[in-house]
């Protein structure tokens, strides 16, 4: 499954195979709780073979049992910690992603998405 995020947003799986639990959320509120699961490789849109979130140290790709999702649904990569933001970059001219903190079950936006204007503001030519 290809997702909007890439290793420029979360470098740790590509660097050293860090494991992050992945769960799915349906966009329009349908329940995925009892949906059948499919063995899934989760990868990003970058033009690099290492842009895979479900890999072990050394680059061995693994699958995760995830419910079938549709375009527009969300995947949550859990436990990314403080290093997600500090290790992220604008590689391939991609804006920085927003970050959400789950605090006692409540989602809180702690970093908004970078705009294209902000991304290009440092360019001189």
Regions found by a protein language model. Give the residues of each.
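Charged (often Lys/Glu-rich) extended helix/loop segments that serve as interaction or gating elements
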Residues: 1-125
């Amino acid at each position: 499954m290809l997702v909007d995020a890439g290793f420029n947003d979360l470098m740790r799986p590509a660097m050293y195979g860090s494991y992050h639990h992945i769960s799915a959320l349906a966009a329009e509120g349908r329940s995925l709780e009892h949906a059948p699961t499919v063995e899934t490789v989760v990868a990003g849109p970058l033009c690099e073979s290492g842009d895979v979130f479900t890999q072990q140290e050394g680059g061995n790709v693994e699958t995760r049992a995830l419910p079938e999702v549709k375009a527009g649904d969300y995947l949550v990569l859990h436990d990314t910690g403080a290093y997600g933001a500090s290790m992220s970059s604008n590689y391939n001219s991609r804006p920085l992603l927003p970050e959400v903190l789950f605090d006692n079950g409540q989602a809180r936006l702690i970093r908004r998405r970078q705009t294209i204007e902000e991304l290009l503001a440092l360019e001189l030519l």
